[in-house]
Structure formats: structure tokens, C-alpha cells
Amino acid sequence: MGLLNAVFGTYSEREVKRLKPTIQKINDLDEELQKLSDEELKAKTPAFKERLANGETLDDILPEAFAVVREASKRVLGMKHYDEQLMGGMILHQGRISEMKTGEGKTLVATLPAYLNGLSGNGVHIVTVNDYLAKRDAEQMGELYGFLGLTTGVIVHELNNDQRRESYASDITYGTNNEFGFDYLRDNMVIYKEERVQRPLNFAIVDEVDSILIDEARTPLIISGQGEKSTEFYKVADYFAKKLVVEKDFTRDEKANAVMLTDEGVRKAEVTFKVANYADAENIELQHYVTQALKANFAMRRDKDYMVKDGEVIIVDEFTGRLMEGRRYSDGLHQAIEAKEGVKIARESKTLATITFQNYFRMYKKLSGMTGTALTEENEFREIYGLDVIVIPTHRPIARKDNPDLVFSTELGKIKAVASEVEKAHAKGQPVLVGTVSIEKSELVSSMLKKKGVPHQVLNAKFHEQEAEIISHAGEKGMVTIATNMAGRGTDIKLGEGVVELGGLKIIGTERHESRRIDNQLRGRSGRQGDPGESTFFISLEDDLMRIFGSEKIQGVVEKLGLQEEEAIESKMVSKAIENAQKKVEGNNFDIRKQLLGYDDVMNIQREVIYKQRSEVLEGEDVKEEILSMTKDIIADAVNTYVTGESEDYREEFLHLMVALQDICIAPGTVNLPSLENLSNEEIIESLFESARKFYEHKEEEFGAERLREVERVVLLRAVDTKWMNHIDNMDHLKQGIGLQSFKQIDPVQAYQMEGSEMFNDMIKAIKEETVRLLFHVRIEVAPERVRVAQETAAIHEESSSAAAPGPGQNQPGGPGGPSAGPVAPVRNLDKHGRNELCPCGSGKKFKNCCGREA
């Protein structure tokens, strides 16, 4: 490949070359547009819309539209797009990923395809990683769009539904991935179509696309309601875990991030919890509590994986070091950590709606993204999202010097060397940015610098409010900044006066991240737009990556050299070994995400069926024919179940049949049983259906057609929502237990597909039965009205219950590495009704003989 690339250029270089004729067309329009008055320039927008209405395509008007945006940007923002930014904009319009280095002006690049696609009137979503960036970009770029006659909206956490609806109705809408995803889920929980806020998903431009579509893709978005399980047992399990001794009672597998009881540990559990056999299926819930207590105490680290703030356990994002307020680990792990830390334990919640980012973003008609680092994950973008990555050349050549890694034998020696290096740079006034992988490490470096009297600012999850402010000053003379990973991403570091002469911003990485992309992001903070700069990674053999994934060969080399504590070696072999370790971890993480997607694809097909059904009901379509079709299905199912001809007395079969159907859709005394004696099953079905249809026609006369249509919609919505929520719960339990199938040499994803499909069919059958039963028994004086079947209590981007987020069957509860919570009956939130009171559904029966049978 190297030789071919040398001769023909890389794929990106060839694609960029193909854009050049269009760039020339845009540049040729420059002079003409400069002569236009502001009013004449603004008039271009309605002219473009008219041309689109007359049959021209977006591609036809692209050169002119881009040229108009460029001229307007120069007038309104004082910034004119470079040729490279025009290239980036064209790649985004084509539905691809533009890899553009830090400082190349990605925010400005997005205005080109956003304006062009905004002309269609179908909406453009620009997706950012946090509310601050969404507000900032909408405010700044909104001036440009407003000048050109397009509207801009922003979606942030605190907006109410009316404000959200208004923002989504704008031509261009900025917002975070979480907000867009949650609004989609909420729109599919509404009971009136007017409550929806989103329009159909048209075109998304995802900023920091690697962070959103890859780093965050391991964890689903979940809207939840209050569960009913007690939290007391988490405390008991925590007390038990704290008494255990490592290696004697349990073992730790750091690579898989799993903790498992030894035989001695199992014996202690049996004594403590007074059970004969800990491994028995009846103790599956006990195993679940103990597994999570072990993980909380021995795999999850405070100030690395999570923080305790104001009596609350808050997850720390492993990629950015940011606090993930409002997110919780799933599967009871969060409760186990709360027990470990002695803070208030929140109840486990019940999932009302859920989706992964992979499946949410794949629903857009066109998807594109931009980032400084995507090429290392090119395969994943192509395989999962059908997106290819095009590297856009920098406007000026990169002048940053990337030094080889320095390898130390101990962690302490490395940190001392980092502090000395910072002290040297600070003495001459060169600004330094020190990147760490955790809050813990940030504080260690900070304390070393304090001892040396070096003034510095610390940017980590604890101070994330001042993030943009701190990072924007990091390039000033004499400034030393310690940042957890990529905190502050999205804010440019501009060099202060006299810093260029000192060599620009110096980057020091204190550890290699398990993803090469994160390391490249840290490096990319220096040397923006052709500025000078340098970067060096300081590594020790005690670092997590080296300890867990590094080879013994490296340790052997370093030990032979007999290095002093603060001595380091530079070695290509070591750098290569580190890169191989990173590739290994990246490959493993890709497999995990692929497996997660395999599971969610099953749910996705089911979700589409349910949401389509809801949408049809909400749109006010006449569902009478569907109700009658459901009725016929129920009758056919009952006839084929009970009338088999196997019983000696056919009357016994008919008796069972009538008992089953009278409860659902056949009125007592309306069927003459002897008349069915000599009929085939098909004829029996037709006869019974005719009887049911007549009964329903009578019901329609009693209610009035219009009123019954609304009752049908109410009942169908309620049945769909109740059964779907219970189904989500059941599928979740299935997923947790399915990993055990790998012991039987069965692919867990295939087993999940098959069993999940059966469960879905059962749910559809249950929806039909409940809908038909309620409609055939509803009485005019207690006709039901539309109400939500469950109230949302939280919208969380749920964290996987493992820090390494393994897929089902990979050392998580339910996989070979640990027991499962097992398929327990889903928690149901039913209003408390007396068993002998009339059922609130309007059937006229006692609660215990109607809906109360399910409770």
C-alpha cells in the first residue's frame, strides 16, 4: 500500500483533488459577490429557494450558495472561509466525515453545508458535545444565518416543550447528542401528536464525531420511571464485600475489569447469607447483589471512574475527564457504589424508553461529521454508519515537533521528571499543557509543582464549570495548565504575545491513553494553524496500559538497563509496543460496540414496529379495521388452540373455547354451540367473527362512531405503551442472562434474536388481547381518556455497568465472568385499586377479574 500511495496518493488526497474544480467555481464568484450590497446579497436566499422549488438540486446551487455564505461571513463575522474550509464543507454536504486538525475552524466550516441544506426547509441539526458549545455556536453563527434570512434554534437541557418545538422548527438547530436523542424518545411517548417537538430527521452534522459516534456509542440513552425494589440489600452485600481478602476470597482480572469469588469466597457467602448452595438458580438475585458489591469495591476507583460530590456519586467520563451529571451506571452498579461510599442509595429505575446513538443517528436521511481525529477509527465509521473519512489538508503546514516517548521505570520517577520539565519551560516563559488520564493523576502532578513553587491552573472534572475560560488562557506566556484528558475540547488555545519565539505551546502527556485518538487529540492542542509547538509523552512501566497490556519484553529491556528513578529511555521498540497495545484495546472496544449494536438491532426492529403503530394512532387514522382484524386473529388463535378434535367429547372443546373468548370478545348467549358442530375450523372462525363484529357494531351505535374511534385510540395507545415498557424490561433481563448461552457453544446474539423475537410475538398477542378485551367490555359512562401509562423520572445516558463496558457475555453479570440478575418479573407501576372494586379500565368487571390479574 505504501508504494501505491506514493504513486497515486492516499484515498483522501484523491478525493480532495476531485473537489478542486468546484473550489475554483466558488472562487470565481468572489469578485462578483463583493460588489453586491447587503440587501442584494440577502436576496440570494429566496432566489435559491425558488430555484430549488423549480427542480434544481442542492448540488446544482452548491458553488453559488457556498460563495454567498463566504461573502456574508466576511461581512458579518469578519471571517472568510479558506479553500480548505470550503473542502471540509463539501465533504460534510456529501454525507461524509471531514478530518480537520484543531484550530482549522470547524465551527465556521459547518455554516456552509448548514446554509445549503437549510434552504430545503427540512431542517439541519448541528450536534455538539455539551450545552456550552451548542449555545456558543448557535449565538455566534446565528448572526450569519440571520443575515442570510435563515432561522437558528438551540436545544439545551432547561427548555420546555414549546421552546423545543420552536427550536426544531428553525432552519438550523444546534444541540447536544443527548438532547436530540431524548427528544426523539419522548416524542414516541406522547399521547397527542401536538405534544411532539421534533420534525422528521433530515440532516445531521456531528461535531467531535469520534467522541459522539464512537466513545459514547457503548452506552444507550434511557428514559426511566421509578422502580419498586428496596435498596437495603445493597448495604448488606457491601458489608460482606468489605470483609473479603483479595486472592484468598476473590480474584481480579484487570483486562476484563472483572472481580470473581474464589471457592473460599463462595463458602463465606454461603455462611454469611445462610444458603446451602450459592450457585443455585434460586440465589440468582443474591449473586447479582454480591457481584455488583465486588465490582464497586474492587474494580471501580474513586476520582478515576467516579467522584463523590455533595453526597452524590457522579461518573467521570473516561475519555474527557468531565463529570457526567445525571448519568448512572446500570444494572445496580451505581447503587452498589453508593453503598460503598456511604451516601444515599437511589432506587433502581424502570426503563420506559431506550435507544443507542448508533441507531438514533442512523435514522437521519443524511449524516456527516467533523473532528480532528477520525482516521484511526475509519473502519468503524464505515462499517457501522456507512461513513468514510476524508482528511482535509491544513491551511498552513504543521510546525509542531512530536518527540519520541520517554519511558521511566516507576510512576513516581516519571511524575518527578514531568515536574522538572515543566519547571524548565516555565522558567523561560513557555506555556505548558500537561495532559493526565484521571483526576487523581492531575492532583499528583499539581502537588509536585506546588513543591517546586511553579504556579499553575488545574482543569479537571471537579472544575468543569470554568473549563472554556481556563483552556482559552493556556497559551499565554508563563501559563502552566494541567488538564484531565481532553477537557476543554471545542475551545481554541491561542498563543499569547511572544510565545511563538519561545517555541509555542509545549504539550506533556503523562500517560498513554488506551485509544491512540485521545493521544492525538492532546497533541493537536499545540501547533494550530501553523504555529510552532512540541509534544512529548512521559510513560512508566507502572502505567495501566503498560501494566495490563504491555509486553514483558519491554520490562525486561528497562530492567536490564538498570535505570535510576528519574532516568528515561527513548526507544522505537517501546513506542511500537505501546502502539500495538493500543491497537489491541481499540480492536477489543470495537468488538464490544459491534456486539452492543447486534443486541440493539434486535430491539431497533421491534422499536420501529411499535413507534410506527403509535404514530398511526396519534395521526388520528381510523383504527376500526385494525381492531376487527385483531379480533379475528384472537378468535382464530383460540379456535386452533382449543378445537383440535383430540377430545372424545367435542362439547368439552367448545366449552373451553367459549370460556376463553367470552372473557375477550364474544358476548355470552350470542353463539349457538350446536350450530358449530359440523363446521371446519375456518368456518367456525368466520361464524364467531361475524358474531363478534355484530356485537361491536352495536357498541358503535351505543357510543356514536366518532366517540368510539377516540376510545379505540386511547385503549390501543394504553395497551401498546404498557406492554412495550414491560417488554423492554423483559428484553433487558434476557440480555443479562443470555451470555450464559456461550457456555453451550451458542452465539449469544443469535440466541437473543431468536428468544427476543418470540417474546415480541407474545407481546403483540398480549396487545391485541388487551385492546380487544377492553373495547368489547367498555361502557359508555366510564369511557377511558388518554393518560400516560408511566411518568418519566429521569433521562439518562446510561453508563454500562462495567468500566470497560463489555458486551453481554463478556465478564459482566450474566456473562461467563459472573452471575446474572436473571429474568425476573418486570416491575409494573399500576395504580393501587381494591381487588373487589370495579376495574378502572371501564370493563364493568371487578379489578381482580380484569386488569388486576396481571398486577
Curated annotation (Swiss-Prot):
<feature type="binding site">
    <location>
        <position position="850"/>
    </location>
    <ligand>
        <name>Zn(2+)</name>
    </ligand>
</feature>
<keyword id="KW-1278">Translocase</keyword>
<feature type="region of interest" description="Disordered">
    <location>
        <begin position="794"/>
        <end position="845"/>
    </location>
</feature>
<dbReference type="GO" id="GO:0017038">
    <property type="term" value="P:protein import"/>
</dbReference>
<dbReference type="InterPro" id="IPR011116">
    <property type="entry name" value="SecA_Wing/Scaffold"/>
</dbReference>
<keyword id="KW-0479">Metal-binding</keyword>
<keyword id="KW-0963">Cytoplasm</keyword>
<dbReference type="GO" id="GO:0005829">
    <property type="term" value="C:cytosol"/>
</dbReference>
<dbReference type="GO" id="GO:0005886">
    <property type="term" value="C:plasma membrane"/>
</dbReference>
<keyword id="KW-0067">ATP-binding</keyword>
<dbReference type="InterPro" id="IPR014001">
    <property type="entry name" value="Helicase_ATP-bd"/>
</dbReference>
<dbReference type="Pfam" id="PF01043">
    <property type="entry name" value="SecA_PP_bind"/>
</dbReference>
<dbReference type="Pfam" id="PF07517">
    <property type="entry name" value="SecA_DEAD"/>
</dbReference>
<comment type="subunit">
    <text>Monomer and homodimer. Part of the essential Sec protein translocation apparatus which comprises SecA, SecYEG and auxiliary proteins SecDF. Other proteins may also be involved.</text>
</comment>
<feature type="binding site">
    <location>
        <begin position="103"/>
        <end position="107"/>
    </location>
    <ligand>
        <name>ATP</name>
    </ligand>
</feature>
<dbReference type="InterPro" id="IPR011130">
    <property type="entry name" value="SecA_preprotein_X-link_dom"/>
</dbReference>
<dbReference type="GO" id="GO:0008564">
    <property type="term" value="F:protein-exporting ATPase activity"/>
</dbReference>
<dbReference type="InterPro" id="IPR011115">
    <property type="entry name" value="SecA_DEAD"/>
</dbReference>
<dbReference type="GO" id="GO:0065002">
    <property type="term" value="P:intracellular protein transmembrane transport"/>
</dbReference>
<dbReference type="GO" id="GO:0005524">
    <property type="term" value="F:ATP binding"/>
</dbReference>
<keyword id="KW-1003">Cell membrane</keyword>
<feature type="binding site">
    <location>
        <position position="851"/>
    </location>
    <ligand>
        <name>Zn(2+)</name>
    </ligand>
</feature>
<dbReference type="Pfam" id="PF02810">
    <property type="entry name" value="SEC-C"/>
</dbReference>
<feature type="binding site">
    <location>
        <position position="839"/>
    </location>
    <ligand>
        <name>Zn(2+)</name>
    </ligand>
</feature>
<dbReference type="GO" id="GO:0043952">
    <property type="term" value="P:protein transport by the Sec complex"/>
</dbReference>
<dbReference type="Pfam" id="PF07516">
    <property type="entry name" value="SecA_SW"/>
</dbReference>
<dbReference type="InterPro" id="IPR036266">
    <property type="entry name" value="SecA_Wing/Scaffold_sf"/>
</dbReference>
<keyword id="KW-0862">Zinc</keyword>
<feature type="compositionally biased region" description="Low complexity">
    <location>
        <begin position="801"/>
        <end position="811"/>
    </location>
</feature>
<dbReference type="InterPro" id="IPR020937">
    <property type="entry name" value="SecA_CS"/>
</dbReference>
<dbReference type="InterPro" id="IPR044722">
    <property type="entry name" value="SecA_SF2_C"/>
</dbReference>
<dbReference type="InterPro" id="IPR000185">
    <property type="entry name" value="SecA"/>
</dbReference>
<dbReference type="InterPro" id="IPR001650">
    <property type="entry name" value="Helicase_C-like"/>
</dbReference>
<feature type="binding site">
    <location>
        <position position="85"/>
    </location>
    <ligand>
        <name>ATP</name>
    </ligand>
</feature>
<keyword id="KW-0813">Transport</keyword>
<dbReference type="InterPro" id="IPR027417">
    <property type="entry name" value="P-loop_NTPase"/>
</dbReference>
<dbReference type="Pfam" id="PF21090">
    <property type="entry name" value="P-loop_SecA"/>
</dbReference>
<comment type="similarity">
    <text>Belongs to the SecA family.</text>
</comment>
<feature type="binding site">
    <location>
        <position position="841"/>
    </location>
    <ligand>
        <name>Zn(2+)</name>
    </ligand>
</feature>
<dbReference type="InterPro" id="IPR004027">
    <property type="entry name" value="SEC_C_motif"/>
</dbReference>
<dbReference type="GO" id="GO:0031522">
    <property type="term" value="C:cell envelope Sec protein transport complex"/>
</dbReference>
<dbReference type="InterPro" id="IPR036670">
    <property type="entry name" value="SecA_X-link_sf"/>
</dbReference>
